[in-house]
C-alpha cells in the first residue's frame, strides 16, 4: 500500500528538486583542468602538478553531484515525472553536444584525408607514417566494445523484467569489457610508430581515439555507480533513470567507436 502510494505521489507534475550548485562547480573544475592540461602540454612550468589536482577536484565535485541526485531520487522521492523529464532532456542535450564535438574531429580528419596537401606528401597517411593495421588490435577492441553493448542491453532488459541477478551479471561483464578495452587502447598507443606530434594525421588520430577513450572511462564510471545502486537495491523495474542514462551514454560510445574504426582505422590505413 505504501509502495503504491509512493508511485502515485511521484506521478504529480510538480518539480521538487532544489537548485543545485554542482553544475556550476563542475564547469569551473573542468575549465581549470582543461586550462592546466593545455598549458602543461605547451611546456609551462608548474602545471604538471596542477593537472592531477584538477583531476581529483573534478572527481570530488562529480561525486558530490552524484550523491545529491541519488539522495533526491532514492531517499527523498523528489524525482517526479517533471523532474525525470528534465533529467532525460538534459542527458539528451548533453549527448547531442558530444555528437557535434566528435563531428568537429571527423571534419578535421576528412578535411586533410580527402585532399592531402603537398606538405603531407600528397598522400594519406602522410609520407613516412605507417598507420595501425585495422585487422589486429583495433578489430579486437571493436569486438570487445560491441560485446559490451550487448551485455549492457541484456542487463537493462533483465532489470525491466525483474531479473535482478541478470542485471547485476550483465553490468559486471560490461564493466570488465570496458576495462579490457581501455587497457588494449593503452597498449596500442605504446606500440604505435607515430605520436600526436607527427603531422595532422597523428593529431587527429590521437585526439579522436583519446577523446573517445576518455568517454569510455566516464561511461565506465557511470556504469560502476549503476552497479553499486543495483547491489544496494536502489533501482526497480520502473524507476532506474540514472542507470538508463548511463546505458544510453554507453551506446553512444559504441556508435562513435564504429565511426572511428571505419574512418580512421580502416579507411585511413
From Swiss-Prot:
Gene3D superfamilies: 1.10.287.70, Cytochrome c oxidase, subunit III, four-helix bundle. GO terms for molecular function: cytochrome-c oxidase activity. InterPro entries: Cyt_c/ubiquinol_Oxase_su3 (IPR024791), Cyt_c_oxase_su3_dom (IPR033945), Cyt_c_oxidase-like_su3 (IPR000298), Cyt_c_oxidase_su3-like_sf (IPR035973), Cyt_c_oxidase_su3_a-hlx (IPR013833). It is an enzyme of class 7 (translocase). Component of the cytochrome c oxidase, the last enzyme in the mitochondrial electron transport chain which drives oxidative phosphorylation. The respiratory chain contains 3 multisubunit complexes succinate dehydrogenase (complex II, CII), ubiquinol-cytochrome c oxidoreductase (cytochrome b-c1 complex, complex III, CIII) and cytochrome c oxidase (complex IV, CIV), that cooperate to transfer electrons derived from NADH and succinate to molecular oxygen, creating an electrochemical gradient over the inner membrane that drives transmembrane transport and the ATP synthase. Belongs to the cytochrome c oxidase subunit 3 family. Component of the cytochrome c oxidase (complex IV, CIV), a multisubunit enzyme composed of a catalytic core of 3 subunits and several supernumerary subunits. The complex exists as a monomer or a dimer and forms supercomplexes (SCs) in the inner mitochondrial membrane with ubiquinol-cytochrome c oxidoreductase (cytochrome b-c1 complex, complex III, CIII). This is Cytochrome c oxidase subunit 3. The lineage of its organism: Eukaryota, Fungi, Dikarya, Ascomycota, Pezizomycotina. The gene is cox3.
Amino acid at each position: 500500500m505504501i509502495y503504491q502510494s509512493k508511485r502515485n505521489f511521484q506521478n504529480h507534475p510538480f518539480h521538487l528538486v532544489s537548485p543545485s550548485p554542482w553544475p556550476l562547480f563542475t564547469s569551473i573544475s573542468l575549465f581549470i583542468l582543461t586550462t592546466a592540461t593545455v598549458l602543461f602540454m605547451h611546456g609551462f612550468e608548474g602545471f604538471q602538478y596542477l593537472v592531477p589536482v584538477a583531476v581529483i577536484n573534478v572527481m570530488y565535485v562529480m561525486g558530490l553531484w552524484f550523491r545529491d541526485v541519488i539522495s533526491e531520487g532514492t531517499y527523498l522521492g523528489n524525482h517526479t515525472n517533471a523532474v525525470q523529464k528534465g533529467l532525460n532532456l538534459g542527458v539528451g542535450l548533453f549527448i547531442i553536444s558530444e555528437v557535434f564535438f566528435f563531428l568537429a574531429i571527423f571534419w578535421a580528419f576528412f578535411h586533410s584525408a580527402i585532399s592531402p596537401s603537398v606538405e603531407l606528401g600528397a598522400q594519406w597517411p602522410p609520407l613516412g607514417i605507417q598507420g595501425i593495421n585495422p585487422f589486429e588490435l583495433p578489430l579486437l577492441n571493436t569486438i570487445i566494445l560491441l560485446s559490451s553493448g550487448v551485455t549492457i542491453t541484456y542487463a537493462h532488459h533483465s532489470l525491466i523484467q525483474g531479473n535482478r541477478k541478470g542485471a547485476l551479471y550483465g553490468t559486471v561483464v560490461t564493466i570488465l569489457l570496458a576495462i579490457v578495452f581501455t587497457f588494449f587502447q593503452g597498449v596500442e598507443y605504446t606500440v604505435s610508430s607515430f605520436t600526436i606530434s607527427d603531422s595532422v594525421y597523428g593529431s587527429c588520430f590521437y585526439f579522436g581515439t583519446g577523446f573517445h577513450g576518455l568517454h569510455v572511462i566516464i561511461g565506465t564510471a557511470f556504469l560502476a555507480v549503476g552497479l553499486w545502486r543495483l547491489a544496494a537495491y536502489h533501482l526497480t523495474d520502473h524507476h532506474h533513470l540514472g542507470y538508463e542514462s548511463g546505458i544510453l551514454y554507453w551506446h553512444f560510445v559504441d556508435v562513435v567507436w564504429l565511426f572511428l574504426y571505419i574512418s580512421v582505422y580502416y579507411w585511413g590505413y
